[in-house]
Amino acid sequence: MNKFLTALLFALALLCFGCGGQQGASADGKMQVAASFYPMAEFARAVGGDRVAVYTMIGDGIEPHDWEPSARDLTRLAKAKVFVYNGGVEPWAQPAVAAVADDGVQAVEAGQAFMQQLDKSDPHFWLSPRKAAVEVAAVHDAFVKADPEHAAEYKQNAAAYIAKINALDEKLMAVAQNAKIKNFITTHAAFGHLAADYGLRQESIMGLSPQAEPSPAALNKLLGVMQADGIKYVFFETLVSPRIAETIAQAAGAETLVLDPLEGLSEAGRQNGDDYLKIMERNIENLNIALNGK
């Protein structure tokens, strides 16, 4: 965290000289919104529509768990009207929020309700459609507070987007109810909330950190689970090397599929027009394949 503190002090020094411009508004009058990483930015754009200018602090193709902001990042954050973050994924967020509080930045921890109720070690709430809808509602509430003049638009946008998330919920519920196999193998334990909300069980290769290395005993246990339950697929994700997933799949005579934790878009995904809803659709399709041993 020394790197973060150095950047924080430098950014605060820059702010003392004044940044210029209207706080929280872009040149075209849109409300400036900072989002910590991809799903938070997606939710902010969905709720804000044409009334907001959203920028993502953690760029495309970057794994967010170990990212830390630079002085430039913090200086830009201080110009935002609203800062949207998940909670749990961004250990730097709360110190940053405290640092820019005097600049009028309104922070919303989209997953706050779940951070208070559930195991804080797994903050991947956005991967369960049911919890994602709650996070979108939290973003809506923050925007209405920051910009009450356009509350009706934010309400309409949020309702429309939540309806689309609810459609994902219905599809996933149907897949889970009809599944022949109730557990699945993932690279890292990002899908615990999805599994819990839909009556499934996640078995992870590398725990909550996508960079962790599994022990030989853990690998043997996973192979045993796969054999006992007839699991024919091992999921890997887009921003982390598939090497270990491929090794386990080969040892078990299984195949690999993508289960995207949506922590960031790849460049290819951005060019293809991917978004949260489309990627979650593919996740559900791949879960259907894996849970039925197709």
Predicted region positions:
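Short, low-complexity disordered leader/linker segments with a strong preference
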Residues: 1-30
